[in-house]
C-alpha cells in the first residue's frame, strides 16, 4: 500500500498543502479537488495511479490545511496551481481535476504553456464568455449562497460527522474510504475537543459566489478580467467528462467547455454522480489511464 507524504509550499500566510503518492522520478500527475473537499478525497484514485505516475494533490485555497486568504476568483486558484508547478518544477504534467478544481487546471495550463501533457477534467465549472449575460445572480442562487452560511460547521467528533454525512444524499454513494478521508482531513480540532470544518461556511459561501456567477453566465471577474476566453487557446489534449446521474448544470458547463476548447474529446461515466472519483474510483482510474496512453 502506498501511503501519501504530506508537505506544504510557500510561507505560512500563503501556504499550499500537498499530498504526494509514490516516489519522485515518474511522470507527474496533479490532482485538484472540487469545492468544499480536500486533497485526501483522491486517495483511492491516487494510490492506483502511483504505480505509473508521481501523484500530487493539493488542498485548494480555503480548504484543508492550505491558506485561507479571502480571495477566491478563478484566476486566484489558477495562480496557486502555477505556484505548485513552478515550485516543484513539474513538466509534462497529467492534470486531473474535478468541478472547480478542473477549472483551476484548465486556466493554469493556459498560463503555463507547454507544461501540461494532457488534462482530464470531470465536469469543470465553465462559463462561455461569448454568451455572457448582464446583471447579477438570480435570487435562487443568492439564496443558495445564503443557505451555505447556515451550514453546520462544528461537531462533537469525527464519528458523529461520518454518521451524519453517510446519511446525507450528497455523500450516500461515496466509498467509505473517501468519506473517512474527507472527515479526517476536512475538519480541524478545537480546544474543547470538538471539530470544525476547515472550509467554514463563510469561506465556502465566498468560494461559491463566482462559481454560481459562472454557472449563470454573469461572471465578470476582477481587475484581471474574465479568464474563460483563454480556453480557446489551450495547447494540450483535453478530455472533458460528465456523469450520467449528475445535475443538468454540470452537463451544460461541460458542453460549454467542449465548445471552447480546441480538439477536446469527451467521456461519460455511467451510473455515477457529480463526485464520480469518490463514488467509483476504479472507473476513474481506468478512464484516466486510458486517456494517458
Set out the residue ranges of the language-model regions.
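Conserved hydrolase catalytic core segment
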Residues: 48, 91-137
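Conserved acidic catalytic loop of the alpha/beta-hydrolase fold
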Residues: 76-93
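Conserved serine/cysteine hydrolase catalytic core
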Residues: 177, 187-259, 265-268
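Alpha/beta-hydrolase fold catalytic core
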Residues: 1-31, 51-53, 90-91, 126, ...
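The conserved beta1-alpha1 loop
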Residues: 32-34, 98, 242
Amino acid at each position: 500500500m502506498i501511503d501519501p507524504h504530506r508537505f506544504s509550499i510557500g510561507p505560512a500566510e500563503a501556504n499550499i498543502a500537498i499530498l504526494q503518492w509514490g516516489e519522485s522520478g515518474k511522470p507527474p500527475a496533479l490532482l485538484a479537488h472540487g469545492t468544499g473537499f480536500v486533497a485526501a478525497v483522491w486517495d483511492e484514485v491516487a494510490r492506483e495511479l502511483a504505480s505509473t505516475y508521481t501523484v500530487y494533490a493539493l488542498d485548494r485555497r480555503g480548504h484543508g490545511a492550505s491558506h485561507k486568504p479571502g480571495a477566491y476568483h478563478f484566476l486566484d486558484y489558477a495562480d496557486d496551481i502555477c505556484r505548485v508547478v513552478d515550485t516543484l518544477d513539474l513538466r509534462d504534467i497529467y492534470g486531473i481535476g474535478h468541478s472547480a478544481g478542473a477549472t483551476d487546471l484548465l486556466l493554469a495550463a493556459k498560463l503555463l504553456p507547454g507544461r501540461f501533457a494532457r488534462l482530464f477534467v470531470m465536469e469543470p465549472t465553465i462559463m462561455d464568455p461569448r454568451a455572457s449575460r448582464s446583471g447579477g445572480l438570480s435570487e435562487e442562487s443568492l439564496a443558495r449562497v445564503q443557505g451555505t452560511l447556515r451550514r453546520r460547521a462544528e461537531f462533537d467528533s469525527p464519528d458523529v460527522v461520518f454518521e451524519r454525512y453517510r446519511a446525507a444524499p450528497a455523500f450516500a454513494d461515496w466509498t467509505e474510504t473517501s468519506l473517512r478521508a474527507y472527515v479526517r482531513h476536512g475538519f480541524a480540532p478545537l480546544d474543547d475537543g470538538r471539530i470544525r470544518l476547515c472550509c467554514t461556511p463563510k469561506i465556502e459561501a465566498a468560494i461559491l459566489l463566482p462559481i454560481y456567477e459562472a454557472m449563470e453566465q454573469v461572471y465578470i471577474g476582477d481587475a484581471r478580467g474574465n479568464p474563460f476566453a483563454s480556453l480557446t487557446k489551450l495547447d494540450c489534449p483535453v478530455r472533458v467528462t460528465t456523469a450520467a446521474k449528475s445535475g443538468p448544470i454540470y452537463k451544460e458547463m461541460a458542453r460549454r467547455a467542449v465548445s471552447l476548447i480546441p480538439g477536446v474529446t469527451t467521456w461519460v461515466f455511467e451510473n455515477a454522480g457529480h463526485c464520480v472519483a469518490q463514488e467509483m474510483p476504479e472507473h476513474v482510474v481506468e478512464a484516466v489511464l486510458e486517456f494517458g496512453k
